[in-house]
Amino acid sequence: NPDATKIFLADGDVLGIKTSVLIDILKYIQKAFPKLRRISAYGSTQNVLNKTNEELEHLKENKLNLVYYGIESGSDTILEKINKGVSSQEIIDTINKLTNSNIKVSATIILGLGGIAYSREHILHSARIINNTQITYLSTLQLGLDDSIKDRFFKSFIDYFASTDYDIINEQREFIEQINPINNIIFRSNHASNAIHLSGTLPKDKQKLVEQLDVSKIMGEEIIIPMKYRGF
C-alpha cells in the first residue's frame, strides 16, 4: 500500500545491521512511502548498547520512531536462570539509551516467567524497571513453553514450578498495582497467550484494571480464555 503510514521492519533484530546500511534502508522506505509517519523494529540489549548515541539519533532522524523491546523480567535471578544474557541494569541502560535519542520503547514482560517460587521477585523487580524508565507502551504476555524448548528451559531453571491461570491473574494484578511510572504508559495485555485481555493507560486506569482482574478471579472459567483458543 503506497499510502501506508506505519511500517515494521522484518521479524528480527534489525538493529544488528550496520547503521549506515540501516539508514539507507530507512531512506529507501521513506521514498517508497511518502505518507510514512513511523517505522518500527525489534531491538535487543546488545545491539542497542553497541550503537552510539549519534547513530541512534540518525536512525530517529530517518523515522525509526519505535523499538519493540523484550524486558521479560527485571529480576537478575530469573534473567540468569533463563539465560537471557543481560542484567537488569543493562535493560535499564538500553531503554534509557533509546529514549534519550527520542526513540519510543514498547516493552514486554512475560507473566509466569518466575513460576510460583519467584513470582513476587519477578513482579517487584519488573515494576522497578518500568518505574525508573520512560517507556511509551507496555505489554504483558503469558509464558508458553513450546515442546522444542521445554527441556532446555527446565534444565537451566530446575526449581521452576509452573503458575496456574489464577496465579497469573494475581501476578498481573500485583504488577499493575506496583507500577507508578514517570510518564503515562499505554498498557495492553491482549497477546493471544493471555488468560485475560486488558487495556488502559497507566497510572490513570490502574484501579479499573485491578477491578477487572478481581472480577475475572470471581467469574473464573466464565471469563478466562480457554487454552485451546490461545497462542504462544
Model-derived segments and spans:
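Catalytic cores of alpha/beta
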Residues: 54-56, 114-132
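Conserved SAM/AdoMet-binding glycine-rich loop
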Residues: 1-100
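Auxiliary Fe-S-binding modules of radical SAM enzymes
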Residues: 128-232
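Aromatic/hydrophobic pocket-lining residues that form the small-molecule binding cavity
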Residues: 22, 52, 91, 123-126, ...
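Alpha-helical structural signal in soluble globular domains
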Residues: 24, 28-32, 58-62, 97, ...
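Short, hinge-like loop/turn segments at secondary-structure boundaries
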Residues: 58, 85-87, 124-126, 156-158, ...
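Conserved strand-turn element in the central/C-terminal portion of the radical SAM core barrel
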Residues: 46, 70, 74-78, 98-122, ...
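Short beta-strand segments at enzyme active-site cores
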Residues: 4-10, 68, 105-109, 138-144, ...
